[in-house]
Amino acid sequence: DIVVDQKPMESVKEGLRYVYNTKELLGALSLDLFAVLFGGAVAMIPVFAKDILNVGPIGFGWLNAAADIGAMLIIFIITLFPVNAGQGKKLLIAVGGFGICIIVFALSKIFWISFAALVLSGILDGFSMIVRGTIVQLKTPDHMRGRVMSVNSMFINSSNELGQFESGVAAKLMGVIPSVVFGGTMTILVVFTTWFKAPSLRKMEY
């Protein structure tokens, strides 16, 4: 039965409990939280455009749009060629590849390599978002859907904002390039940890 008079905080707690007890959901949402938290190179794009790649406003615009271009491409590709098997494993590989792209972007001194790395990061991030969103829908029963989607939104929104904060703090402490390399490396480390700690997510297929 649907409870209509439940207090908001109780609903949130129930959603968190369900996510925590469903390992595929916990793995998928944690993967997104920490990958975005550590892989937030987008916040540093203005610095890379001006001080490292030495490109003007047009170059900055292309760099800023690169990840979105990649995301649009993968949406079009998956519409034509759906992901048919091994989705959990492919999700982890995509997030790991995203971390590698962030490292390549950090180390590149050539505009087109930086641009290509960001486009590919957008493709991989878009792929992981599609697969992760499908897993969340499939593993959530109808009576829990609103609560779990609220938790999902909380994870996404908090990781985006905290990721930009982490990027700024890390850049201040380490320098811009080392901080972005650190973020990409931590993203890969999160993937390795999830690979072994969440086997049910790794083996997930739909």
Language model segments and positions:
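Transmembrane-helix terminus/interface motifs of multi-pass secondary transporters
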Residues: L37-V47
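Hydrophobic alpha-helical transmembrane segments of multi-pass membrane transport/permease proteins
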Residues: S30-V36
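C-terminal transmembrane bundle of multi-pass solute transporters/carriers
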Residues: K13, Y20, A28, I45-Y206
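A generic short alpha-helical patch detector that favors 3-5-residue windows
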Residues: V4, L37, L92-V95
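Juxtamembrane intracellular "pre-TM" segments in multi-pass secondary transporters
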Residues: D1-S30
